[in-house]
Amino acid sequence: MMSDQSKRQGMSRRELLASAGTAAAGMLLLNEVSGADNPAAKVGDRASSIKITGFKTYPVGSKTLLKIETNQQIFGWGEVSQLPPTVAGPLVQSMFELLDGENPTRIEHLWQKLYRAHRDYRGGAFMLHTIAGIDMALWDITGKLHGVPVYRLMGGPTRDRIRVYPTPKAYKVPAGGPRPASGNPADIEPLVKSVKEARERVGKDGTVMFDAHCCLPPPMLIQFANAIEPYDVLWIEEPAVPGNIEVFKRIKQSVKVPLASGERDRTIWEVIPYLQERCIDIIQHDCAHGGGITQMKKVAVLAETYTVPLAPHSIASFLGIAASFHVTASIPLFLIHEYYANDCGGTLKKSWEVDKNGDSSLPQGPGLGIEVDEAALAKIDPTKFKWPGQKNPDGSVADY
């Protein structure tokens, strides 16, 4: 037999359930009424129904421009950089099997799918350069779909301009190719002279960098680095062959000039040893070489945890530069960006401007912010790609 208190509690529960049911019915009615009057309620999620339907490739010298098409007449452009078109084209065609019919806004999923589809093919320049071009196009599509620049999809801009080089106030001295290494101080004299002249050219407030291109043996590199200390060099680039962490550590322990590398370290898995061993000061990730926007953003975040800034490497066209600019615009730790104007024979129109001080505005418009003249692009005669064949003074194979 229920007590008076239990009855009161039971009544309270019944009343509560009854009132909840009434409220639910009221909300349903309200939704029906507001749905009729509110245009926003009728808008579907376009991102859930968009599908990849096709692709096209256009060879331009050592680059292949890539177009990915969708069922919503939104397309995206990317660049497969520094691969023979005879390699890039078939690779894109082969990888398209993994993309056909997929939702292009699932960028991370598709990156993982492309990279991990065959475990024996993971990594390496051919795969990562190709994935980079595809990844750029997917971000371009997603930005256009939502009507925003790509950097808006990555947390928004952290800066309103991007410092670039080379400019009259920022100059990188090249190594000039392999040199004999006899152990003589005379071996490095021409290089030291080039750095000194560069400093005089840009002035005290300018920026001087040196690109070693892995050309100098470690003892010679150390000797050279110590000799250029008075000229306040921002960095020595690629002081050793990428991946040889022990050599990087040895050099880092022997010099005061900051060391930079990363253009050929294409993923977070290749970058992490440098950071863990504290043997470089600046990461030079290349968006077009290292898996595209998706991987570059991860490298930047990883480097941030070690307080190592990004100074992106780039020898890409405006398409590849745009992709790199969008990541650069969205990260906190940035130093300076390599930049060479390349519109692929007048077929690419950029959406930023570089001022006389070497500062670039951010890309504008939805997606990557690049207009492509596809008709003109289709008329370009592909030039035959020639494999480089560098040699040391004695005829042996050189890295640069």
Please place each PLM-identified region on the residue numbering.
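C-terminal segment of N-terminal export signals and the immediately downstream linker at the start
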Residues: 30-62, 66-68, 75
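Extended hydrophobic packing segments that form well-structured cores
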Residues: 368-400
